[in-house]
Amino acid sequence: MTRPASAKRRSLLGILAAGTICAAALPYAAVPARADGQGNTGEAIIHADDHPENWLSYGRTYSEQRYSPLDQINRSNVGDLKLLGYYTLDTNRGQEATPLVVDGIMYATTNWSKMEALDAATGKLLWQYDPKVPGNIADKGCCDTVNRGAGYWNGKVFWGTFDGRLVAADAKTGKKVWAVNTIPADASLGKQRSYTVDGAVRVAKGLVLIGNGGAEFGARGFVSAFDAETGKLKWRFYTVPNNKNEPDHAASDNILMNKAYKTWGPKGAWVRQGGGGTVWDSLVYDPVSDLIYLAVGNGSPWNYKYRSEGIGSNLFLGSIVALKPETGEYVWHFQATPMDQWDYTSVQQIMTLDMPVKGEMRHVIVHAPKNGFFYVLDAKTGEFLSGKNYVYQNWANGLDPLTGRPMYNPDGLYTLNGKFWYGIPGPLGAHNFMAMAYSPKTHLVYIPAHQIPFGYKNQVGGFKPHADSWNVGLDMTKNGLPDTPEARTAYIKDLHGWLLAWDPVKMETVWKIDHKGPWNGGILATGGDLLFQGLANGEFHAYDATNGSDLYKFDAQSGIIAPPMTYSVNGKQYVAVEVGWGGIYPISMGGVGRTSGWTVNHSYIAAFSLDGKAKLPALNNRGFLPVKPPAQYDQKVVDNGYFQYQTYCQTCHGDNGEGAGMLPDLRWAGAIRHQDAFYNVVGRGALTAYGMDRFDTSMTPDEIEAIRQYLIKRANDTYQREVDARKNDKNIPENPTLGINP
């Protein structure tokens, strides 16, 4: 599975030499500050500012502020920044990872859980590791086969795989040291289990920490801690109760059995589905408080009424939970969204910092989860200190000033009142996995925020889970956007993306940047008073951290959702970012996922420096013309086809049958022209190796055929609109939205 440095890779379109990131390679020399000792690694992360040339952990330091003191690249010269080179990836899906740099070597995880080890100065491939994740696992996760990053400790690099494994490899050679399956064979996890691992690994006190995802399908969340040297499980903490209130023989037994179970009750869909509460992103160790913080996700199913019969707050959904690192013992929790029914996870970034609160310096957690509120908590005790919405939201009338609990808008409790609810934020949140940053120079938190509304409506007839599909307890035909000019125009006006400079003391926006649309990348803050961010429209920017002035722009030719990072080798500063459009927004939202532009996926790692001379090759593949669809379709089965499509296909191939630039747009797929060919792909799994699973156990042949007929109708409905959007003499789109506007 490991390929040595002699293995060759093609660079982007064959322009650069194999495995090369730098147009003018520099000789590699080890930097003096080393981080490869058992005792040294944790101390090196704690004292990261003593050797800022490295980037040793997902957020650089345990505080996860994503701030680097490097200032060779600064406001005065960032306009001279150039592409130094790029390293092409062989996974053209979403790239969300933050590479690590340890003593001059870059460790970058990519889609499908692959690992690339590169010389950080030259881009030379040192080794790569492919864990061979099965293609049919792709539809077991909600949001693309992404990976957000690795951990490093004692000469080993660790990362999770989409199918649930944790791999430890020798950092120098790439040879596997150990690997474990992080998902136990335990019936208490729910009958319909669907676990994936895509979060960044964290390592602290010799423990490798990893969570998982899967609550959209059926899962019971937990976090595991493994010995970094041996891979032995040290402890496990479940985030929601055992459905029989029995011990799991885990660190969480006492708190779940004596407190959390009472907030659920003995009945409801959670008993079958597991309850959710997966920790798929933020998982943080704070050396100041000596605590581990779990950022806990949504319920399984989403629907509160169906999940627990509308009873209780459902601990620990939508919460931060603090544990003792050595044992996993519960210390405290704060639940931001009790009774969650909107997919308002709290898995978004947990950051610690010191700031004044009522005239006293406090060590705090700052947190901007999906629900649209910014929270400040005491890091040691979990005490709620302050909270305020950082964007517009309509589900709550504010927070209780003493407890931080939401004061609900009754109209927003759609699962209890049975009404349709146009929710802001929607399930993609006001802030998602895109990392925020903090600058100790400006004392501002920089949030990549967005607004993506959603239509919530109870599933008709109660909770009816489907195999091989999302099971959230909603009517999936009601969240689809009506294909009328009026509906599209109204919805598009409600889509927004921002970079917010937020004052955590005054709890207010100091300045903001309006982007062309939502789903933009994470933030890096530097000592040069700079912010770096990639955008959904394929631009990579540097902004003035003090006022948001746009100081630099680069056309990356693909949407960027990953956060940048920075490092130095031999005294020279670099900025790097993984490029590659993807994630749940473009794969599920259909045509409206193109509001920022036609952001096709071209995946690579880009490195920038002040003396860069590389250029990306001209890219001209955005102007394809749609294939004229078959003229005839069976109107009698189209409605059933729409239901089946929204149930099984929409979350990967786009709302209303429209793609958004990453996975195949099925309206123009050749297979829709032939019934047998379509069934061979959808029913028999002809493309399983590429991530398209088979559905013959979930749907009948007639239901699969109804989907084909629906897609033919959608192709006919939208063909001329898509062609008109591309009209010029070279058939290259002039309108970046490619026909999504009426």
Curated annotation (Swiss-Prot):
Give the encoding gene's name.
Answer: adhA
Identify the residues that bind heme c. C649, C652, H653, M692
The molecular function terms in GO held by this entry are: calcium ion binding; electron transfer activity; heme binding; oxidoreductase activity, acting on CH-OH group of donors
Topology of the protein relative to the lipid bilayer: Peripheral membrane protein
Origin, by domain of life? Answer: Bacteria
The residues the record assigns to binding Ca(2+) are: E216, N298, D343
The broad enzyme category this protein falls into is oxidoreductase
| Paired cysteines (S-S) | C142-C143
Name what cofactor the protein needs. Answer: pyrroloquinoline quinone; Ca(2+); heme c
Q: What is this protein called?
A: Alcohol dehydrogenase (quinone), dehydrogenase subunit
Q: How is the cofactor bound?
A: Binds 1 PQQ group per subunit. Binds 1 Ca(2+) ion per subunit.
Annotated region Disordered: the residues are: 722-742
At the highest ranks, the source species' classification is: Bacteria, Pseudomonadati, Pseudomonadota, Alphaproteobacteria, Acetobacterales
The protein's Enzyme Commission number: 1.1.5.5
Read off the InterPro entries from this record: Cyt_c-like_dom, Cyt_c-like_dom_sf, PQQ_b-propeller_rpt, PQQ_MeOH/EtOH_DH, PQQ_rpt_dom, Quinoprotein_ADH-like_sf, Quinoprotein_DH_CS, TAT_signal
Q: How does it assemble?
A: The alcohol dehydrogenase multicomponent enzyme system is composed of a dehydrogenase subunit I (AdhA) and a cytochrome c subunit II (AdhB).
Q: Name one Pfam family in it.
A: Cytochrome_CBB3
Q: Where is the composition biased (Basic and acidic residues)?
A: 722-732
The reaction(s) annotated as catalysed by this protein in its Swiss-Prot or TrEMBL entry are: ethanol + a ubiquinone = a ubiquinol + acetaldehyde
Question: What are the entry keywords?
Answer: Calcium, Cell membrane, Disulfide bond, Electron transport, Heme, Iron, Membrane, Metal-binding, Oxidoreductase, PQQ, Respiratory chain, Signal, Transport
Kindly indicate where the leader peptide sits in this chain: 1-35
Q: Does the keyword rRNA-binding apply?
A: no
* Family, similarity comment: Belongs to the bacterial PQQ dehydrogenase family.
> Which species is listed as the source?
Acetobacter aceti
Q: Please list the residues that make up the active site.
A: D343
Cited SUPFAM superfamilies: Cytochrome c, Quinoprotein alcohol dehydrogenase-like
